Amino acid sequence: MPHFIAECTENIREQADLPGLFSKVNEALTATGIFPPGGIRSRAHWLDTWRMADGKRDYAFVHMTLKIGAGRSLESRQAVGEALFTLIKTHFAPLMENRYLALSFEIEELHPTLNFKQNNVHALFK
């Protein structure tokens, strides 16, 4: 953990530069010092079927979720959320200037015992 997941409408695939966004997000998460680098993952789910608002325009959206393990303070979660949303808005600013685009972001804290993981990548970062 953490996992950064972007749900994106297909009509912005060419312009969204999600590899660039993921690079920035992973760097920012590592820089906080509160997440183990070996657990950071970013991925996209492209949506080929959606409807927004009245459906009359070529609207687009990106909804992003950061899933994190339990145990971090509200203050640290708030700081991470604000920093990431600033980064997200900056990344998508050029696209937002040229089309209708909705951005949303949430942090989801997983249950402390009802999630299960195995990862040997952590050893590379110790």
PLM features: what roles do these ranges have?
Residues 5, 63-65, 104:
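Short aromatic/hydrophobic contact patches that present stacked aromatics
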